[in-house]
Amino acid sequence: MPRMTQLDLIRNFSIVAHIDHGKSTLADRLIQLTGTVAERDMKAQILDSMEIERERGITIKANTVRIDYPAKDGRTYVLNLIDTPGHVDFAYEVSRSMRAVEGSLLVVDASQGVEAQTLANVYQALDAGHEIVPVLNKIDLPAAEPERVKSQIEDVIGLDASDAVLISAKSGLGIPDVLEAIVHRLPPPKGDREAPLKAMLVDSWYDAYLGVVVMIRVMDGVIRKGDRVKMMQTGAVYGIDRLAVLKPQMVDIAELGPGEIGVLTASIKQVRDTRVGDTITHEKKGCAAPLPGFKPAQPVVFCGLFPVDANDFEALREAMEKLALNDASFTYEMETSAALGFGFRCGFLGLLHLEVVRDRLEREYDLDLITTAPSVVYQIYMKDGTLQELHNPTDMPDLTYVDHIEEPRIRATIMVPDEYLGDVLKLCQDRRGIQLDLSYAGARAMVVYDLPLNEVVFDFYDRLKSVTKGYASFDYQITGYREDFLVKMSILVNDEPVDALSMMVHRDRADMRGRAMVEKLKELIPRHMFKIPIQAAIGGRVIARETISAMRKDVTAKCYGGDATRKRKLLDKQKAGKKKMRQFGKVEIPQQAFINALKMDS
């Protein structure tokens, strides 16, 4: 069983990179070269355990591996790598992982250069006080321009890149230099073994056999198997059943000391009981104050998830419960919709989080789902001085009682090649954006915009990719709430409001959004035996209308010649029947119509 390691032989680090710049591949090579995993067990993206992580090529949960590295100076070092998510939705997970380590490898694709996400994550690493080693990956590509990218790192980020490590993670070129750079250029952790235990909860996940597995970084003191520990935010106390380090499989260990990263199990039933960023200490003689910077995860984007087949509702509920075991930032509550039946209103950290959860529900639990239009949380200030949070546009209170509405704003950073800059600026202006900054790094422009989150959650990312042919990269932080003139737009089909299609829009854009929506629905809803009006309305005022004409049966076909009043009588009878039908008829809106209507270009 491995023993505790002395501080100056430990190096804790994370890898910072934009999607597809080779972060997980580099982690694979480091693991392979040091023999941490046997060759026969090696597979691509070994740290990405979810199938969806491998398929999308993204990292969602923070994962860790402990590598024993015999360095050239004759000493064996323990390297703890935390593989962090790169995507903005998981920014809080990134910030916690960053605080658990002392240094970062900044991986930049030598052919593509610095991207928006690289910037966001580097700033987090600098905030956490990291030593950063730049690594240029993919230098064996014909398009690689290491010198240009080095100067870009210096210009855009302000890091000295003169001694950047040049590698190709795919072929393994330069990997030994990375290991030496980790040992000699990153600092060892600090900590006091004699002090009371203070450990940070970096991540947690649910295991069917062990219950909740908690990943910790020990700051001070020593933690041993059998200790009784307390979570400082929740006050819960647990006895430790098992302590281990991850290589990536669990290897049991008797104790963990300062600077070490490992996992523990303690018969914890739910991931919700373990909050990322919490401080763990001993039940008796614990530390006085928790580690700073803890904040509970707040959902930002909400949408309804409904089963296509109403009989799948129970299966969906079970799947949600299982997912929530493993994802504390995902919230859900039951809701009913006249159009879609029973389902759930779910809260997510962002759009990627929404897509990942939906994909996992569909793939791992084999469910067919309808997603309603994503919406954000609005703050509604009432005239009586109270504040309401609005998660679902259907619950909008009567406007006569509302003083004003505030919506969340974001600071978006977009990196884009020069030739597409005009299209990007136009897109941001169309989305009610306010330009804050524009700077150049070589042939790429970096634009910073203040945008309403509501305009981004719908299809901003897809539009951005299409106007820039996929070359733009985008990252955002939520900056706060601001008052704006927002209204609830309802869609009525045959004079019945369809709750699943109602949305919050800015007053200036309501007419355009309403017109586009009713035109789209006119194409999507099949014709019935009676005519169907489709209307977009704000309060009692209709702002757009289309009518689907009725199917017509030729009732006069059997009249040959003769009196015109005979035909008239038949036509009047048909007209009366249609009128009655329209009063009592139910309009069937196909599921596909919902899905397509919600995907519309705005």
UniProtKB/Swiss-Prot annotation:
GO terms of biological process kind: positive regulation of translation
Annotated catalysed reactions: GTP + H2O = GDP + phosphate + H(+)
Statement: the UniProt record of this protein carries the keyword Repeat: no
Top EC group: hydrolase
InterPro entries associated with the record: EF-4 (IPR006297), EFG_II (IPR041095), EFG_III/V (IPR035647), EFG_V-like (IPR000640), EFTu-like_2 (IPR004161), G_TR_CS (IPR031157), LepA_C_sf (IPR038363), LepA_CTD (IPR013842)
UniProt feature coiled coil, ranges: none
Presence of the UniProt keyword Metal-binding in the record: no
Binding site for GTP: D20, H21, G22, K23, S24, T25, N137, K138, I139, D140
Chief location of this protein within or outside the cell: membrane
Membrane topology: Peripheral membrane protein
UniProt-listed Enzyme Commission number(s): 3.6.5.n1
Domain of life: Bacteria
Pfam families in alphabetical order: EFG_C (PF00679), EFG_III (PF14492), GTP_EFTU (PF00009), GTP_EFTU_D2 (PF03144), LepA_C (PF06421)
Domain tr-type G residues, every copy: 8-190
One MF annotation (Gene Ontology) recorded for this entry: translation elongation factor activity
Function: Required for accurate and efficient protein synthesis under certain stress conditions. May act as a fidelity factor of the translation reaction, by catalyzing a one-codon backward translocation of tRNAs on improperly translocated ribosomes. Back-translocation proceeds from a post-translocation (POST) complex to a pre-translocation (PRE) complex, thus giving elongation factor G a second chance to translocate the tRNAs correctly. Binds to ribosomes in a GTP-dependent manner.
Subcellular location: Cell inner membrane
This protein's UniProt keywords: Cell inner membrane, Cell membrane, GTP-binding, Hydrolase, Membrane, Nucleotide-binding, Protein biosynthesis
Name listed for the protein in its UniProt record: Elongation factor 4
Family that this chain belongs to: Belongs to the TRAFAC class translation factor GTPase superfamily. Classic translation factor GTPase family. LepA subfamily.
GO cellular component terms given for this protein: plasma membrane
